[in-house]
Amino acid sequence: MGAETMESPSLFLCKGLLLTASLLICWNWSTAALLTSKEMRFSAAEGAKVLLSVPDQEENLLSFSWYKGKDVNENFTIAHYKKSSDSLQLGKKVSGREEIYKDGSMMLRAITLEDTGFYTLQTFKAHGQQEVTHVHLQVYKIVTKPYLQLNHTRLKRKSASILTCVSPDTGVDINWFFNYKPLNATERITLSPEKRELTISPVWRADVGIYLCEVSNSFSSKKSYPLLMALAYG
């Protein structure tokens, strides 16, 4: 019976890295397999372009492949580049919006919410070095411009007024403005739990003016057109 070979221990490190779009990078180094495993995170707004770039890839680079998802599998190949022949082969998961660069980076153009997920870069370098980088892309929705609705077109003093911030977006933050300054809630001026409705009861002369609402998420914000609230007399 042959002698058993003891597998070399691996070292796992996880360190924060501050980049323009990257949030986290971790790596797992195995001296036995000369294999390095990393994870990076990027975020961008829908409709934009984003460069998925892994640092320090160009030196001693022989070839690399990009995959859709976390599996290194031919069926999920986006593209494969071979330096010796300067050739680029497209795979089954190419969408036509990719640009592949010789340093191993990949540009995605006109990204959509469906592009959110993992991408994997596999690189082969001199001396048998292999590196696998899992890149997570988070695509954020650009919010839609909201608009204001008023429950009555003719308001009278001491009546109740309800303004509604209308937006098709969900999971957003809503802020209100009066005469272009942040509006503070009071006993008379209250907000619904999701802040989509602003109720003024009773309406006073001091409430006459311009109202706006703003819808925002982590990546974008938009304000409604101003609405002038006035009182009717007689």
Swiss-Prot record:
Q: Which UniProt keywords apply?
A: Disulfide bond, Glycoprotein, Immunoglobulin domain, Signal
Per the UniProt entry, the disulfide pairs are 165-213
Q: Which residues are reported to be glycosylated?
A: 28, 75, 151, 184
Q: Does the keyword Disulfide bond apply?
A: yes
Pfam families, per the entry? I-set, V-set
Tissue occurrence: Detected in placenta.
In the UniProt record, the signal sequence range is: 1-32
Q: Say which family it is in.
A: Belongs to the immunoglobulin superfamily. CEA family.
| Name the UniProt record assigns to this protein | Cell adhesion molecule CEACAM15
